[in-house]
């Protein structure tokens, strides 16, 4: 799968990323390869004057390691970014709907994605599903003081929700925004409706279902790179 990630990352960057763009950079294993390749193109001079806006502390670390300057303060931005490039945990090709958030950064990933003209997703073949929720739970970022209320509400809906635990710290996972994450097991019949519905719950900051109006997907399947 690692080779597939490298191939789709290179294809996406070669075909979509141009000099002088403002780019949002997501989080995850596929983005690692995208950052490595972006670094090569910047150092060779084939890409110039790019501005990078990050979605997580992990991404900041990777960019710093490649000596790529980045912006983490979005308060002065008054227009959309050109492209947000990111990976996905599950992809429903027919609707271009996604599950993201297994890395715990989906709130800022969505802020960046939904304030970009294009959301460019890169993925290996394991991420393609026929229904969202098939392989992965739906991540929900929740205010710490609201987690009990939200879990009760989900139980009343007959949904199984688990508080994500950080193995290293032996306690609940804390996001970069100082919130908790609930992983909810459910098959998503209506991605857009589900995203909107859960955002109505007081205490839910964000749900890891993405339905960007202009999503481009570069993925590997049947031994070749495809686009949707």
From Swiss-Prot:
Binding site for substrate: 27-30, 86-89, 100-103, 127
GO terms classed as biological process: D-ribose metabolic process; pentose-phosphate shunt, non-oxidative branch
Class in the EC hierarchy, top level: isomerase
Active-site feature positions: 109
Keywords of the record: Isomerase
NCBIfam families noted in UniProt: rpiA
Protein name as annotated: Ribose-5-phosphate isomerase A
Organism: Borreliella burgdorferi (strain ATCC 35210 / DSM 4680 / CIP 102532 / B31) (Borrelia burgdorferi)
